[in-house]
């Protein structure tokens, strides 16, 4: 009896059927040609054997019908060689083709590796049917199915969020000793792994494959590398999965990543994350904490700074040296909604840093450009955050040292505030906010920022202390110098060669005038060299519009020095240079018109018309003149090389323009065209033209284009410029006035600057270490009718009292208060409210600290008051 464990045996001359081989291919023998005898019998659909055939043992001819049916189908389908079909069945691929294009951004075809176990099942079925009497042995376990994963497959799975398709990923990685951070699983263009891909494809804020991927990375031993794997392309370089989770506003994934070891100080430095003026799209400060702050996510900010795993350092700076406060200033855009969230986030971070790092002042950190957040707000024109910083008032005693505004005393709606002048007015020791606002012409709204308190009152105080007196002294001095220069030029000797001898009293007076003129020229030269080339932001616009007088003074000084050098060298051409300097010197006297409001805007109109309207007009007009002069001169008859004599042959002349065309006709004709433009020309040359009609047509079109069109366009443009300047005359004059004050202050030596410094040294409270907090502050008397009964954080309870008072156990001296301050406050209040609309309500910025517990939040109505109501 045959052993049941053996397969079917082949008889003599028969070919045994191999297990798992349905085609009946003989093993060890050549393929018989007689097997092709009945090739064309049957159809493709007749491959299924009958139940009787299936139950009988395999015989010697069982493989032939199968071959016959396969070859028959091959001929019907057009296969040229049936043997190729036979070989294709022997080596059939086990990879099932996938879809033509993978989802998302992949362009690769992919498939899944599968094992065909049906052959073994058929072989076992034949054995069981052949020997039914043997006991049924337990079926062997099939080999495990090993899936094949590559980048397109993996990215498709995580994009769909299908955790079931990731079942075979871990065995595949362990079997082939691979990791999810290998290059074959990264996007070639960006270096992106499957974790950022999953975070970018969330459904309702979730993607169930993310925890599975993290678990697989932990089992393969590269969890931190997998989480912190950054983008490597130039566009998104440095971005990690933590950045994406924060940007997607998924706090649960932020917590998961940080708990697993995500780098909370990773820096995204790609081109996409640069400022817009540098070709980027969204600059947020590179760091994850800055991204959470700039996208208004305080809950994530709190977690990053207070989590038990790895806290984000709020003092960390990016590649530009910017902290998270700098980043908030950078994204501010002066809109209401943006300013509201930026200021709240700014206060949150500032207070949190003060509690976590008491010895550090986050607001004092400078970036690579040497700018603090306050200076950066001033330089970029972010008036919302700028006003909030300089007027910040903290009521909490633990963080009161962060205040920049302190209420000294209050009486009804009137209160006196002390503003911290640190960084605002530095007396030349370092760059100040005031200088940035005045000299940086790139700030379009700087006149609005100069109106913010205490900047406005600070400029007034400087003008009262030294600005007005110094300005009028400069006016008188400059006018005297120009009169001396004029007299010196007028009384130049008419005979001889320079340098002229000095013999008489008049000669010695002329010598004194020349020395004074040369001294003023040298003084202006070095002064303007310092002003033009040592300013923080000169720029082209600053030089030719805002700094036009500095440039003109510099040119004037150069002309004076050159004229003096030519005079000493004995060259008579010094006189031509001197007269240009004389004209320019008198024109520069317009600089002093900015000291008066009546004439201040007039000089601004002249500057804008010269550098804007007139420049464009002259450019177009010059092109017209050259074109028409070339055409009209070509129509003139050339001059003959013969003399025209009268009858007596004694007075002979050579014909020249306008009777004909000679070598100097073009330059002379340009002057004639200019005369025609202003209505002073004549047509003497018309008689010497070849085609008078063409000549007249050209002249008429020239007059229409220049005299009628261009001149009227110039007048219209100048009128528009004057109208624009008139609308903003107050702001423009105030800006010029502020520039004049700072120019005068910068001309003083350091000791004079400190002597005329505005403000007073005041002890405003305690520092973070408990020592007295002494600051240089500037006092501003203000009035507020909307929140005037909430001044709970005042320093002095007696309004206008000039004495030493006690505050929390130690003395504080306000110092240098005017005794008549209270008497000066009431007229100031009346002035501020004289022209105001009764319906207008001034809403101040929210103070930092606990909400007020005061129930009386409104003042007296302005249309009535009680008998005991304060004035």
From Swiss-Prot:
N-glycosylated. Residues 1-469, 535-547, 594-608, 723-871 are cytoplasmic. Changing residue 799 to L: In MTD; also found in a patient with spondyloepiphyseal dysplasia Maroteaux type. One of its GO terms (cellular component) is cytoplasmic microtubule. A 1,2-diacyl-sn-glycero-3-phospho-(1D-myo-inositol-4,5-bisphosphate) binds at residues 249-251, 296-299, 344. Residues 491-507, 569-572, 637-665, 686-693 are extracellular. Residues 812-831 are annotated as: Interaction with calmodulin and ITPR3. Keywords: ANK repeat, ATP-binding, Calcium, Calcium channel, Calcium transport, Calmodulin-binding, Cell junction, Cell membrane, Cell projection, Charcot-Marie-Tooth disease, Cilium, Disease variant, Dwarfism, Endoplasmic reticulum, Ion channel, Ion transport, Lipid-binding, Membrane, Metal-binding, Neurodegeneration, Neuropathy, Nucleotide-binding, Phosphoprotein, Repeat, Transmembrane, Transmembrane helix, Transport. The modification Phosphotyrosine is found at residues 110, 253, 805. Channel activation is inhibited by binding to phosphatidylinositol-4,5-bisphosphate, and to a much lesser degree by phosphatidylinositol-3,4,5-trisphosphate. Not inhibited by phosphatidylinositol-3,4-bisphosphate and phosphatidylinositol-3,5-bisphosphate. Gene3D superfamilies: 1.10.287.70, Ankyrin repeat-containing domain. It comes from the Eukaryota. Changing residue 232 to C: In HMND8 and CMT2C; does not affect channel localization to plasma membrane; results in increased agonist-induced channel activity and increased basal intracellular calcium concentration; decreases ATP-binding; no effect on protein stability; decreases binding to membranes enriched in phosphatidylinositol-2,4-bisphosphate; causes increased cell death. Ca(2+) binds at residue 682. A motif (Selectivity filter) lies at residues 679-682. Changing residue 316 to H: In CMT2C; does not affect channel localization to plasma membrane; results in increased agonist-induced channel activity and increased basal intracellular calcium concentration; decreases protein stability; causes increased cell death. Changing residue 616 to Q: In BCYM3; results in a gain of function and a constitutive activation of the channel. Changing residue 331 to T: In MTD; no effect on protein stability; no effect on ATP-binding. ANK repeats lie at residues 237-266, 284-313, 369-398. Residues 666-685 dip into the membrane without crossing it. It is linked to Brachyolmia 3: A form of brachyolmia, a clinically and genetically heterogeneous skeletal dysplasia primarily affecting the spine and characterized by a short trunk, short stature, and platyspondyly. BCYM3 is an autosomal dominant form with severe scoliosis with or without kyphosis, and flattened irregular cervical vertebrae. Spondylometaphyseal dysplasia Kozlowski type: A form of spondylometaphyseal dysplasia, a group of short stature disorders distinguished by abnormalities in the vertebrae and the metaphyses of the tubular bones. It is characterized by postnatal dwarfism, significant scoliosis and mild metaphyseal abnormalities in the pelvis. The vertebrae exhibit platyspondyly and overfaced pedicles. Non-selective calcium permeant cation channel involved in osmotic sensitivity and mechanosensitivity. Activation by exposure to hypotonicity within the physiological range exhibits an outward rectification. Also activated by heat, low pH, citrate and phorbol esters. Increase of intracellular Ca(2+) potentiates currents. Channel activity seems to be regulated by a calmodulin-dependent mechanism with a negative feedback mechanism. Promotes cell-cell junction formation in skin keratinocytes and plays an important role in the formation and/or maintenance of functional intercellular barriers. (Microbial infection) Facilitates hepatitis C virus (HCV) replication, possibly through its action on DDX3X. The ANK repeat region mediates interaction with Ca(2+)-calmodulin and ATP binding. The ANK repeat region mediates interaction with phosphatidylinositol-4,5-bisphosphate and related phosphatidylinositides. Belongs to the transient receptor (TC 1.A.4) family. TrpV subfamily. TRPV4 sub-subfamily. This is Transient receptor potential cation channel subfamily V member 4. It comes from Homo sapiens.
């Amino acid at each position: 009896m045959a052993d049941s464990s053996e397969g079917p045996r082949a008889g003599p001359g028969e070919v045994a059927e191999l297990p798992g081989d349905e085609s009946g291919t003989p093993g060890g023998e050549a393929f018989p040609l007689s097997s092709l005898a009945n090739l064309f019998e049957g159809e493709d659909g007749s491959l299924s054997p009958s139940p009787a055939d299936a139950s009988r043992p395999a015989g010697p001819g069982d493989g032939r019908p199968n071959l016959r049916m396969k070859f028959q189908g091959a001929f019907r389908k057009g296969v040229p060689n049936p043997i190729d079909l036979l070989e294709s069945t022997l080596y059939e691929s086990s990879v099932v083709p996938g879809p033509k294009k993978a989802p998302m951004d992949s362009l690769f075809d992919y498939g899944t590796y599968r094992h065909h176990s049906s052959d073994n099942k058929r072989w076992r079925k034949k054995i069981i049917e052949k020997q039914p009497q043997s006991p049924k042995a337990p079926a062997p376990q099939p080999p495990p199915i090993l899936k094949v994963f590559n980048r397109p497959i993996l990215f498709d799975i995580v994009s769909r969020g299908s955790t079931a398709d990731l079942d075979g990923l871990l065995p595949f990685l362990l079997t082939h000793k691979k990791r999810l951070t290998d290059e074959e699983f990264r996007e070639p263009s960006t270096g992106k792994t499957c974790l950022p891909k999953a975070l970018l494809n969330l459904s309702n804020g979730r993607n169930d494959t993310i925890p599975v991927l993290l678990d697989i990375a932990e089992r393969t031993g590269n969890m931190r590398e997998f989480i912190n794997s950054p983008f490597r392309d130039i566009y998104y370089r440095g971005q990690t999965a933590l950045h994406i989770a924060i940007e997607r506003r998924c706090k649960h994934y932020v917590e998961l990543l940080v708990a697993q070891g995500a780098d909370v100080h990773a820096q995204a430095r790609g081109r996409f994350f640069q400022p817009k003026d540098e070709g980027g799209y969204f600059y947020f400060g590179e760091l994850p904490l800055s991204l959470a702050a700039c996208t208004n996510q305080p809950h994530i900010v709190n977690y990053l700074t207070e989590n038990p795993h790895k806290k984000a350092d709020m003092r960390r700076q990016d590649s530009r040296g910017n902290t998270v406060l700098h980043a908030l200033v950078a994204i501010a855009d002066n809109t209401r909604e943006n300013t509201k969230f930026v200021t709240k986030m700014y206060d949150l971070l500032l207070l949190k840093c003060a509690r976590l790092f008491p010895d550090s002042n986050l607001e004092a950190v400078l970036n690579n450009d040497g700018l603090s957040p306050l200076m950066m707000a001033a330089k970029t024109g972010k008036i919302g955050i700028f006003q909030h910083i300089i007027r910040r008032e903290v009521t909490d005693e633990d963080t009161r040292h962060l205040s920049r505004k302190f209420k000294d005393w209050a009486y009804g709606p009137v209160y006196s505030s002390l503003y911290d002048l640190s960084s605002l007015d530095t007396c030349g020791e370092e760059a100040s906010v005031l200088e940035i606002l005045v000299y940086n012409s790139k700030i379009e709204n700087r006149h609005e920022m100069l109106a913010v308190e205490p900047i406005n009152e600070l400029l007034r105080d400087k003008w009262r202390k030294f600005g007005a007196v110094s300005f009028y002294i400069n006016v008188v001095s400059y006018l005297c110098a120009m009169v001396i220069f004029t007299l010196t030029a007028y009384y130049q000797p008419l005979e001889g060669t320079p340098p002229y001898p000095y013999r008489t009293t008049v000669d010695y007076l002329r010598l004194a005038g020349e020395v004074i003129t040369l001294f003023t020229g040298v003084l202006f030269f070095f002064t303007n060299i310092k002003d033009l080339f040592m300013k923080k932001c000169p720029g082209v616009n600053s030089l030719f519009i805002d700094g036009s007088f500095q440039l003109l003074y510099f040119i004037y000084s150069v002309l004076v020095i050159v004229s003096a050098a030519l005079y000493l060298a004995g060259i008579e051409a010094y006189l031509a240079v001197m007269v240009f300097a004389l004209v320019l010197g008198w024109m520069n006297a317009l600089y002093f018109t900015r000291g008066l409001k009546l004439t201040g805007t007039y000089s601004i109109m002249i500057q804008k018309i010269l550098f804007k309207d007139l420049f464009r007009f002259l450019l177009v007009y010059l092109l017209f003149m050259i074109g028409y002069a070339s055409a009209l001169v070509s129509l003139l008859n050339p001059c003959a090389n013969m003399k025209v004599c009268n009858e007596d042959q004694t007075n002979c002349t050579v014909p020249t323009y306008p009777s004909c065309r000679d070598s100097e006709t073009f330059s002379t004709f340009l002057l004639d065209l200019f005369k025609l433009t202003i209505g002073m020309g004549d047509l003497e040359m018309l008689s010497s033209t070849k085609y008078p009609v063409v000549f007249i047509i050209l002249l008429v079109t020239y007059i229409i284009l220049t005299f009628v069109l261009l001149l009227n366009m110039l007048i219209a443009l100048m009128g528009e410029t004057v109208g624009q300047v008139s609308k903003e005359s107050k702001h423009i004059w105030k800006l010029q006035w502020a520039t004049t004050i700072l120019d005068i202050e910068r001309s003083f030596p350091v000791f004079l600057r400190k002597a005329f410094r505005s403000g007073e040294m005041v002890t405003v409270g305690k520092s973070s270490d408990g020592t007295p907090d002494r600051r240089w502050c500037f006092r501003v008397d203000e009035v507020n009718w909307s929140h005037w009964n909430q001044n709970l954080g005042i320093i002095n309870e007696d309004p206008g009292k000039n004495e030493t008072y006690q505050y929390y156990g130690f003395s504080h001296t306000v110092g240098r208060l005017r005794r008549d301050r209270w008497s000066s406050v009431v007229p100031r209040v009346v002035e501020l409210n004289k022209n105001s609309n009764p319906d207008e309500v001034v809403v101040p910025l929210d103070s930092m600290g606990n909400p007020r517990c005061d129930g009386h939040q409104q003042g007296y109505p302005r249309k009535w008051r009680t008998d005991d109501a304060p004035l």
